[in-house]
Design a protein with these regions (language model features):
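Beta->alpha turn/N-cap motifs
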Residues: 47-49, 55-72, 137-138, 155-161
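A local structural motif
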Residues: 34-45, 127-140, 275-281
Length: 285
């Protein structure tokens, strides 16, 4: 990995989570259907909370998926890319349970969460201040709620479509709560790029990612077939629906309301005491 901005950069390391929407988004680059002369790309797939924590410790990957909640803790090393994000349009992570808790009731139970630095947890802490939580790997939350280890769980990824067939009830949809509070979409996760790579590499990578997303959207069946290996028990129509929720025209460009939503999310997190310091949101454009 280059250590200086002026170093010749031939290989770009990319890390993202092993879920169907990220796999779909990066398909163009991973399959080399999208190529950039003079550059090659390596891909590492790891769950989002691990990527959040790793980015906090060091700028190991050139480009990394992160939760927007993690950005305040990595902003010295990384800038947000203006594309490649997952945004909920009135929907998002959910608190689910085996029975229909009221909000007052669910405040008094321990909720399994997929990570301290996930955006899901940030919104949970704003919606239900002081609620007791415990970290559980995201793919174990539904099984552990079903087993009775936790009364409720905060689910992300494909669980948003599968909880009902497991007999669980949605207590609160964070995307709905956020939209009611702000009138804005809920920005969940994005991609960040090392600041020290410099503007020319930032611009190259922005275009490469847009081209990758664009390729997948134009060759949907091909890209979806690749994404199915990460779809966690979703059938093809459900995976297609899930991918459509989080990889779309807004993934190509957040738009002004999308960028405002990111700023508002992090500012509100600070105002409500969840994020300890003010956040400077800037994009590598």
């Amino acid at each position: 990995m280059p250590t200086e901005t002026t170093a010749a950069i031939n290989e770009i390391s990319i890390a993202h989570s092993p879920d169907s929407d990220d796999a779909f988004m990066f398909y163009g680059l991973a399959s080399e259907k999208v190529q950039v002369p003079g550059y090659s790309f390596t891909h590492t797939l790891t769950d989002i909370e691990t990527l959040n924590q790793k980015a906090m410790r060091e700028a190991f990957y050139d480009v990394t998926a992160i939760s927007f909640h993690a950005y305040p803790y990595v902003q010295d090393k990384y800038a947000l890319m203006p594309c490649g994000g997952s945004v909920g349009e009135g929907y998002g992570p959910m608190i689910v349970a085996k029975r229909g808790y009221s909000l007052d009731e669910v405040r008094r139970v321990k909720i399994a969460i997929p990570g301290q630095l996930t955006t899901a947890n940030l919104v949970l802490q704003m919606a239900l201040p002081g609620v007791e939580t415990e970290f559980v790997p995201f793919d174990q939350i539904i099984p552990q709620v079903l087993a009775g280890k936790y009364d409720a769980g905060l689910i992300i990824h494909e669980g948003q479509l599968t909880y009902g067939r497991d007999g669980l009830t949605c207590v609160l949809d964070m995307g709905t709560w956020w939209q009611e509070q702000t009138g804005l979409p809920l920005p969940l996760g994005g991609n960040a790029i090392r600041r020290d790579l410099g503007t020319p590499v930032h611009r190259m990578m922005n275009q490469a990612l847009r081209d990758s997303v664009g390729y997948a959207l134009k060759h949907r069946e091909e890209a979806l077939a690749h994404a199915m290996q990460y779809a966690r028990d979703l059938d093809t129509p459900s995976a297609n629906r899930f991918v459509g929720m989080y990889v779309n025209e807004r993934t190509l460009d957040y738009g002004e309301d999308g960028k405002e939503a990111i700023r508002r999310l992090l500012a509100m997190g600070h105002e409500r005491g969840v994020i300890p310091h003010p956040v400077r949101v800037d994009f590598a454009e």
